[in-house]
Amino acid sequence: MIKRDPIKLFDLWYDEVLAFPFKGKDPTAMVLATCNKDLKPSARVVLLKKHSDQGFIFFTNINSRKGKEITDNPFAALVFDWSYIAKQVRIEGKVKILPCQDADEYYASRPVGSKIGAWCSKQSSVLEDRMSFLKSIEKMTAEFHGKSIPRPDYWVGVVVVPMLMEFWQEGLNRIHTRYQYTRSNNMDVWNVVELYP
């Protein structure tokens, strides 16, 4: 039976993958595909930090390559490869930057080393001297010992607001099951179809 709400279906599958005993892969890992202003694509793995009816959230340095690409072209695709439970979820949607408060809250929960890394890493830039980079981490670690570490302005939360969600489940003899959900400007109404495998 087809579920009418893809977010609820995602919740069911996500709970299943979180409960799966094999821990060799991070179930929050998702491939994020973006395009620059010339429509040249790039992809990388990021971690899902939160999801809801509003979308799928990750955090990043907005000055990184992916940050620049979502600024220039605010659309993205996500793929959750859960092959170890014979499932995959594909998402396409609009990209929005979250309010500073959301980024502040998540940043505050991060380990000290991750906070310092966010300050010291010029993500996606050429690293010409690794020793200098490591020394800058040591220096900042000493400077902020026992102190609160503020969030850099360029470290932001990003939400992918889904406009298309596809659920794929492996079947015998490659007779897989695929359900595709889409919505247009009426954000409350999802249309669902089954696709040939």
UniProtKB/Swiss-Prot annotation:
Q: Does the keyword Transport apply?
A: no
Give cofactor(s), names only: FMN
Record keywords: Flavoprotein included?
yes
Q: What is its EC number?
A: 1.4.3.5
Q: In which domain of life is the source organism classified?
A: Bacteria
Where are the disulfide bridges?
none
Annotated signal peptide: none
List, alphabetically, the Pfam families matched.
Answer: PNP_phzG_C, PNPOx_N
What does the entry's cofactor note say about binding and number? Answer: Binds 1 FMN per subunit.
Per UniProt, the keywords (alphabetical) are: Flavoprotein, FMN, Oxidoreductase, Pyridoxine biosynthesis
PANTHER family named in the record? PYRIDOXINE-5'-PHOSPHATE OXIDASE, PYRIDOXINE-5-PHOSPHATE OXIDASE
Function according to Swiss-Prot or TrEMBL? Catalyzes the oxidation of either pyridoxine 5'-phosphate (PNP) or pyridoxamine 5'-phosphate (PMP) into pyridoxal 5'-phosphate (PLP).
The entry assigns this protein to a family as follows: Belongs to the pyridoxamine 5'-phosphate oxidase family.
Q: What's the protein here called?
A: Pyridoxine/pyridoxamine 5'-phosphate oxidase
Please report the organism this UniProt entry assigns to the protein: Ehrlichia canis (strain Jake)
